[in-house]
Amino acid sequence: MLTAEEKAAVTAFWGKVHVDEVGGEALGRLLVVYPWTQRFFESFGDLSSADAVMNNAKVKAHGKKVLDSFSNGMKHLDDLKGTFAALSELHCDKLHVDPENFKLLGNVLVVVLARHFGKEFTPVLQADFQKVVTGVANALAHRYH
């Protein structure tokens, strides 16, 4: 999946990411850009507008939780399936989340990283992160296969 050089680049960069801020924004953007994903978050209260979603404390908190799990995956890039096995089971068997949503969230995360880091998030780093988010999405979808 990733070369040693790519792993070093993404893990070094990830150390600069503020998971609370980036996670909340990424999940919020997912819910705004792909509104059908909101059905999994009905208990989060007001999701009636982009402003409501982006300022929703529960969205921000869950976004941080999502990126905390992603951070754990960044420590286990050689075993993403094992790292995300329990979350794959939860999202498949209990929450019935469409696995396509994992890909969407990964792509939104890449957009948010580019927005936050600008020129520092080079095209090469973006390509490396695209491999990571694809690997995480596949690991989360593993239970569905």
UniProtKB/Swiss-Prot annotation:
It comes from the Eukaryota. Keywords: Acetylation, Heme, Iron, Metal-binding, Oxygen transport, Phosphoprotein, S-nitrosylation, Transport. GO terms for molecular function: haptoglobin binding; heme binding; hemoglobin alpha binding; metal ion binding; organic acid binding; oxygen binding; oxygen carrier activity; peroxidase activity. Residues 1-145 form the Globin domain. One of its GO terms (cellular component) is hemoglobin complex. The modification Phosphothreonine is found at T11. Heterotetramer of two alpha chains and two beta chains. Involved in oxygen transport from the lung to the various peripheral tissues. This is Hemoglobin subunit beta. It comes from Bison bonasus (European bison). The lineage of its organism: Eukaryota, Metazoa, Chordata, Craniata, Vertebrata.
